């Protein structure tokens, strides 16, 4: 079947100031954009149209995969119509769609079938119909497993055969690479978060003289950085990303130097880093002072374009341009606040200092 559009999400799990390790989370997208898709007929053949060379006819002709409703057939440039078998007749119509494989990114293969059987990852014409793209010795047609055959048009009639090949998508990808990442920062607004209290500590001074106490507060703060990519992706393969990281902590959106990192499908964690603040607090006699650790977290969604490359078992590579959104939350700053001190005792109990 036509592969679903998947939403690829890369997550940063651990980091140092020098480098970051990437992991991936994959989720289905509601967006219908994918490189293998149907395009409405417009009187000409679109770029990337899927085709075969039919050498049985004379002269030989190029047949483009088309459909009318869910009925598969071939598109002819001779009359700019889709020819498909239906109702015992070879139908023709200009109201049709042509199958397009943008940038030839999907690795398409014809595989043997017989009497309604289908190889894995066969390409269907509609999500709700069990009709598949096929071809026989006489050209393109439709496979109907329920009827145990391939139908095709021949000399104006609908004909059938039990021997055929089905169009399939090769999903034996062993590696994916995303590079040439270009962020579109113009017009992007960094959402500056409100300062939030992460941790509190209270220091008491029951003595009769002022004391200075050192307070250290620490907190693990989770942030997230990811690339949402609108393209078909493959599960269970190693993926390499070469990209800089937009800095939203300072609201400047400056992009760091590019770094190359490997990641694997299946993770769904976020990054967690420990932050610490230390402050010296002068505490008056017989008083209690509260110290707070405050952090500000900024967010931004930055559109980007990139080149996505697949490597298949056997060494074949395909590539395409992709687009998406880089989503990030970053800690902008942490600091300590000392609140108004409160009285916890009576200084009258303290001996008066001698003159």
Swiss-Prot record:
Tissues in which the protein is found: Expressed by the venom gland.
Protein location: Secreted
Keyword Ribonucleoprotein included in the entry's annotation: no
Main location: secreted
GO molecular function, one term: toxin activity
One Gene Ontology term, aspect cellular component: extracellular region
Modulation of this protein's activity: Inhibited by tissue-kallikrein inhibitor TKI and trasylol. Plasma kallikrein inhibitor PKSI527 and classical inhibitors of serine-, metallo-, thiol- or aspartate-peptidases evokes a minor inhibition of the peptide digestion.
Known EC number: 3.4.-.-
SUPFAM superfamilies: Aerolisin/ETX pore-forming domain (SSF56973)
Domain of life assignment: Eukaryota
Transmembrane domains' residue ranges: none
Pfam families for the chain: DM9 (PF11901)
PANTHER family: NATTERIN-3-LIKE, NATTERIN-4
Protein's name according to its UniProt entry: Natterin-1
């Amino acid at each position: 079947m036509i592969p679903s559009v998947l939403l690829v999400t890369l997550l940063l799990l651990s980091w140092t100031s020098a480098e970051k390790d990437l992991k991936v989370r994959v989720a289905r997208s509601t967006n219908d954009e994918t490189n293998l898709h149907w395009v409405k007929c417009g009187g000409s053949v679109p770029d990337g149209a899927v085709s075969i060379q039919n050498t049985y006819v004379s002269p030989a002709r190029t047949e483009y995969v088309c459909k009318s409703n869910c009925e598969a057939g071939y598109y002819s440039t001779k009359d700019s119509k889709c020819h498909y078998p239906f109702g015992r007749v070879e139908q023709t119509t200009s109201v049709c769609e042509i199958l397009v494989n943008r940038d030839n990114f999907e690795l398409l293969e014809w595989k043997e079938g017989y009497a309604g059987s289908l190889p894995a990852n066969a390409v269907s014409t509609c999500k709700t119909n069990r009709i598949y793209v096929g071809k026989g010795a006489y050209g393109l047609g439709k496979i109907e497993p329920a009827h145990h055959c391939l139908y095709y048009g021949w000399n104006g009639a609908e004909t059938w055969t039990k021997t055929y090949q089905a169009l399939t998508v090769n999903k034996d990808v062993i590696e994916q690479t995303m590079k040439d990442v270009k962020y579109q920062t113009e017009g992007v607004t960094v959402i500056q978060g409100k300062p939030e209290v992460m941790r509190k500590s209270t220091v008491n001074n029951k003595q009769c003289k002022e004391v200075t106490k050192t307070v250290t507060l620490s907190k693990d703060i989770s942030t997230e950085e990811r690339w949402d990519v609108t393209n078909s992706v493959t599960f269970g393969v190693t993926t390499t990303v070469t990209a800089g990281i937009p800095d939203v902590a300072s609201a400047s959106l400056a992009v760091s130097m590019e770094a190359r990192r490997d990641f694997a499908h299946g993770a769904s964690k976020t990054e967690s880093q420990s932050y610490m603040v230390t402050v010296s607090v002068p505490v008056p006699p017989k008083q209690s002072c509260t110290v707070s650790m405050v952090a500000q977290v900024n967010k931004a969604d930055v559109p980007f374009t990139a080149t996505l490359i697949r490597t298949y078992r056997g060494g074949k590579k395909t590539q395409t341009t992709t687009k998406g959104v880089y989503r990030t939350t970053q800690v902008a700053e942490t600091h300590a606040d000392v609140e108004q001190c409160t009285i916890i005792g009576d200084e009258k109990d303290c001996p008066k200092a001698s003159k």
